[in-house]
Amino acid sequence: MAEKFAEKTFTDPSRIRNFCIIAHIDHGKSTLADRILQLSNVVDARDMRAQYLDNMDIERERGITIKAQNVRLPWIPRSGEYEGQEIVMQMIDTPGHVDFTYEVSRALEACEGAILLVDAAQGIEAQTLANLYLAMENDLEIIPVLNKIDLPAADPDKYALEIANIVGCEPEDVLRVSGKTGVGVPELLDKVVELIPAPSPGPSEDAPARAMIFDSVYDTYRGVVTYIRVMEGRLTPRQKIKMMSTGATHELLEIGIVSPTPKKCEGLGPGEVGYLITGVKDVRQSKVGDTVTWAHNGAEEPLQGYQEPTPMVYSGLFPVSQADFPDLRDALEKLQLNDASLTYEPETSVALGFGFRCGFLGLLHMEITRDRLEREFDLDLISTAPSVNYRVVDEAGQEHRVHNPSDWPGGKLREIYEPIVKVTIIVPSEFVGPTMELCQAKRGQMGGMDYLSEDRVELRYIMPLGEIIFDFFDMLKSRTKGYASLNYEEAGEQEADLVKVDILLQGEPVDAFSAIVHRDNAQWYGNKMTVKLKSLIPRQQFEVPIQAAVGSRIIARENIRALRKDVLAKCYGGDISRKRKLLEKQKAGKKRMKNIGSVEVPQEAFVAALSTDEG
């Protein structure tokens, strides 16, 4: 069987091609990967299933790739200068979503080239552009490809021109394939072999090993499986290895390749991609972007570009029934084994009881984590409104980091800084007006705009992250009939005039409803929450005021009218003073009740107030 040559490692680097596929959600990346797996015969026809590389249910259901995957494939080109030679291709499948940009950048670092995959019926999207620029910064060879040319709505000529303008190539150089039918895929693989450079062999055979971690997953039986790309030197089983960011040393229990199921091998040489297992049980020990080297006589310098993942968005997660709290803690621990960028700390809320304050990379990450908790661990959760990380300086010059409204310092504050992001939006040209209005309403500052083609425009804004995390994306979609695409990346911080709005029930603040908003939006938030709660909280025997306050100043108020019994029903005719006496008596009773009565907010009211359109 000629195809088995890819299973031998220590391949000569000149016969290796490492590449990844950059594409937007739904542009057919996983389908194309399926075709490539079939063509190279690494998956038997009987084992084939759609979206072969997306293993999590949630990945298949939403049609997105969350964890990077990698596969080692044999390929014998049928055309071009390498015709008939045995080439080993290593395909790294990257997440396409903006929240996972750092993971994408590490996966790109592990490749020498990238296939830019664009749907021939939709054209390029903002997040694809962001990843494309990332690939160009890493000096990768880009192969532009239009997918889904079998669709009746496809317009390959129009979009080939658009891609050619962005990448800087000729429109006829843009390859056309169909991942579904397999048309053009063999030619694409031949082009990969021809155009993508081979990895560099490193300084010498016996140079100290340096390998970059681009992903790690937790396996119940074997502990953490770390995916690496060897840059120079060799790694073999039973060696002692060292992680350069933490200095921790481990013994290499097993090393191997993924083709597409894990297979043990004798070791990995320069340019090769594979996995290693050290028996460690905690994913945080093998960090994405870290450098692996020998523990003895290892490399001095780590590879460039390692960063600690920093949470951008915070939200409180509380179990609907308090009995589930230990289960939620166990579930978060298990998720963290697989997702090192998730952070959490215990939090108590007067209104919602015990829960956790969790930090996420972005909105999609938050949604997916919540989905997985509910689906895989069968938990019912309430999540509080998302917030970001603020830097607050008080009158005494003390600096505080605040990502929870209940930690907001009281008293006068000297300066408040909020995180800002660079936003790129691609919209059809007829929606430019409404999109710009929306961005300005969300305190955006325009950075510039470019026409990608005559009917598609790229808008660039600097915006506060706090304005985006509520419902910006939904509003953008509704104003552009669903055609807009959005990408954002961190851009530091700016000073802002922010205040904390408290919601008071009968004069008592309810911590779950507090929010940090811009002073101009405080009135709007206060009105919105008081009106919403008025309709959600059941009427009591006495009148209940719902107020919104900034500090000690009340900015909005709604009253829940009291339920009252008709005390005059038994009086037929009769004297007015008799009626007045009964009414006065009722009034005094209500007043006494109001002093001692407390308002129970039903659980459903919390869920409805926190989960429906948050802005």
UniProtKB/Swiss-Prot annotation:
- Where does the source fall among the domains of life? Bacteria
Q: What Pfam families does the database record attribute to this sequence?
A: EFG_C (PF00679), GTP_EFTU (PF00009), GTP_EFTU_D2 (PF03144), LepA_C (PF06421)
Q: What class of enzyme is it?
A: hydrolase
* GO biological process terms, semicolon-separated: positive regulation of translation
Q: Which reaction does it catalyse?
A: GTP + H2O = GDP + phosphate + H(+)
Q: Name one GO molecular function term.
A: GTPase activity
Q: Which residues are in the tr-type G domain?
A: 14-200
Which UniProt keywords are given for this protein, alphabetically ordered?
A: Cell membrane, GTP-binding, Hydrolase, Membrane, Nucleotide-binding, Protein biosynthesis
Question: A GO CC term?
Answer: plasma membrane
Q: Where in the cell is it found?
A: Cell membrane
UniProt cross-references to PANTHER family, sorted A to Z = TRANSLATION FACTOR GUF1 HOMOLOG, CHLOROPLASTIC, TRANSLATION FACTOR GUF1-RELATED
Physiological role: Required for accurate and efficient protein synthesis under certain stress conditions. May act as a fidelity factor of the translation reaction, by catalyzing a one-codon backward translocation of tRNAs on improperly translocated ribosomes. Back-translocation proceeds from a post-translocation (POST) complex to a pre-translocation (PRE) complex, thus giving elongation factor G a second chance to translocate the tRNAs correctly. Binds to ribosomes in a GTP-dependent manner.
Protein name as it appears in the record:
Elongation factor 4
Q: What is the lineage of its organism?
A: Bacteria, Bacillati, Actinomycetota, Actinomycetes, Mycobacteriales
Q: Which gene codes for it?
A: lepA
